[in-house]
Amino acid sequence: MNIPQPAVALARRQLHFIWLIDCSGSMTVNGKIQAVNSAINETLPEMLKVAAANPEVQVMVRAVTFASGAQWHVSQSTPLEDFRWQPVSASGVTDMGRAFRLVADYLGTVSGRNLPPVLVLMSDGAATDDVSGGLQALLNEPWGKKAVRLSVAIGDDADLDMLQKFMSYPEMPPLRAGNPEQLVQQIKWASTAALGASSKLSHNSGNPQMPPLPMPPPPDPGNAGSWVF
């Protein structure tokens, strides 16, 4: 007699996705922070498409804001399909290093079975705290070092040197946005490309290498730095 076997649901591997968002006072100029809010809202449906193509992966989303200090804007990791963006506002200085340390502490609690995290940093200026120490703390964490890290320079005053150091692809410069439309394009590309790259490792869990990004180039920034509406 054939005895039916119980169905066994395969455990989905988690992929932790974190936006790190500059909310300093300069982000109020010409509506930059409003453009960030719009960009993330427009990016979420595209991220859902990437996730749908990788059903064995559970994408968990959080966000960190940094200004005078750093804090979790999204307090708990939330499944992408349940995630709703709450707008951020801007004021204060640029404590980017504290944001790196906050993320480092969190990644230290993430299970080793998961996929490489995705970290997308966006900033329009130079840090006002110990950003080098914060970045080193992030890279000292195994998941911080293995993360797919991309950065977006907003306007012409962003610290391109630090944004380059944050990137996990040294041959690739930070993405640049000189107006709201470009910012939407760059955040959308960075978020979906990085998410897709890390998700593909679910098919080859033994591969320790940094996942390659897809080849479609990020949008041409054109008037980078002008921030013209």
Give a label for each model feature.
Residues 25-58:
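…and closely analogous acidic/polar surface helices at protein-protein or active-site interfaces
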Residues 51-52, 112, 139-147:
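Arginine/glycine-rich "motif VI" loop of SF2 helicases in the C-terminal RecA-like domain
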Residues 20-24, 36, 63, 103, ...:
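DG-centered beta-turn motif at the end of beta-strands
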Residues 156-207:
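Von Willebrand factor A/integrin I-like adhesion domains
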Residues 10-21, 60-78:
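Short coil-to-beta-strand
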Residues 1-18, 23-34, 109, 115:
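Acidic, polar low-complexity linker/tail segments
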Residues 155, 180, 201-229:
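Extended acidic, low-complexity intrinsically disordered regions
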Residues 71-73, 81-116, 128-130, 150-162, ...:
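Von Willebrand factor
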